[in-house]
UniProtKB/Swiss-Prot annotation:
<dbReference type="InterPro" id="IPR016167">
    <property type="entry name" value="FAD-bd_PCMH_sub1"/>
</dbReference>
<comment type="pathway">
    <text>Cell wall biogenesis; peptidoglycan biosynthesis.</text>
</comment>
<keyword id="KW-0133">Cell shape</keyword>
<dbReference type="GO" id="GO:0009252">
    <property type="term" value="P:peptidoglycan biosynthetic process"/>
</dbReference>
<feature type="active site">
    <location>
        <position position="335"/>
    </location>
</feature>
<keyword id="KW-0285">Flavoprotein</keyword>
<dbReference type="GO" id="GO:0008762">
    <property type="term" value="F:UDP-N-acetylmuramate dehydrogenase activity"/>
</dbReference>
<keyword id="KW-0560">Oxidoreductase</keyword>
<dbReference type="InterPro" id="IPR016169">
    <property type="entry name" value="FAD-bd_PCMH_sub2"/>
</dbReference>
<dbReference type="GO" id="GO:0051301">
    <property type="term" value="P:cell division"/>
</dbReference>
<dbReference type="GO" id="GO:0071949">
    <property type="term" value="F:FAD binding"/>
</dbReference>
<feature type="active site">
    <location>
        <position position="166"/>
    </location>
</feature>
<dbReference type="InterPro" id="IPR036318">
    <property type="entry name" value="FAD-bd_PCMH-like_sf"/>
</dbReference>
<comment type="similarity">
    <text>Belongs to the MurB family.</text>
</comment>
<keyword id="KW-0521">NADP</keyword>
<dbReference type="Pfam" id="PF01565">
    <property type="entry name" value="FAD_binding_4"/>
</dbReference>
<feature type="active site" description="Proton donor">
    <location>
        <position position="239"/>
    </location>
</feature>
Amino acid sequence: MTLDIQADVSLKPFNSFGVEVKAKWFAQAHSDDEVREALAYCATHQLPLLVIGGGSNLLLTADIQALVLRMATRGIRLLSDDGQRVVVEAEAGETWHPFVQWTLEQGLSGLENLSLIPGTVGAAPMQNIGAYGVEIKDVFAGLTALDRQTGELREFDLAQCQFAYRDSLFKHQAGRWLILRVRFALNRVDHLHLEYGPVRQRLSEQGIEQPTASDVSRAICSIRSEKLPDPAVLGNAGSFFKNPVVPAALAAQIKQSHPGLVGYPQADGQVKLAAGWLIEQAGWKGFREADAGVHRLQSLVLVNYGGASGLQLLELARRIQRDIAERFSVELEMEPNLY
């Protein structure tokens, strides 16, 4: 066995909230073989397996009585290039933002709007991560996953992944599928998505009239850096709540009493509301109790000022959910996975 399995390991360095909990067993997988070793170890010792990547979408509320396997696989490959469309494959353990930067350095567009999102490549399809008008599903070309029940590899295409807003098949069947590598369809000719006003405004402020994909990436990085705290400095998991999608009638009702409501009409006739706006209107922006709080600049972000437990952060989140439900009749859904 080459897999190094350690006992009673602190997970504080492995979750972006910086919550102090321990894993009963912990290992890092650098290859497919080591992933299989972890599965075999769990089967032999009748242990559950929790697979993590960058730990940026986790809220850990108690010690983990399982083998925690951190995906540390590395590798990026060009699979095909017809001069316009390029298919790139990346291992699940690759850190997301450096991977995005690598694609831009190769002259490839498609991922620039997803710049500076924390986490790993393997976690990106699970959440169908998205930002500034682009989601993983828009650039997805396939993935390879390991069936934890049979040990067999399976290829998934776009339809099989069942992508939806911050959702996928893998989020609902995390106990079965373990994503090993992901493929992306990118372009040698820029097809930029500049629908969001703040991005266009930032480019205009920089005097850029004909932006490249790299220009868009830099603009988005500067916007995100201003709005979102660095987890290395202040523990957080990025946006904590999904933007709720509600019936148009409810959105209109809220707008009557709150004319400044921020909402985006959807193709199905519903309206996607800005969760951060709702939370700010309810007075939670900058709230702090002990070391658990809401960020002073971005109401969507819950923060750990140093000593908050996962349970304290969870209780704060639930208080916010209850308040928003009472004020606006809107149910907020948490983005991070709870353990």
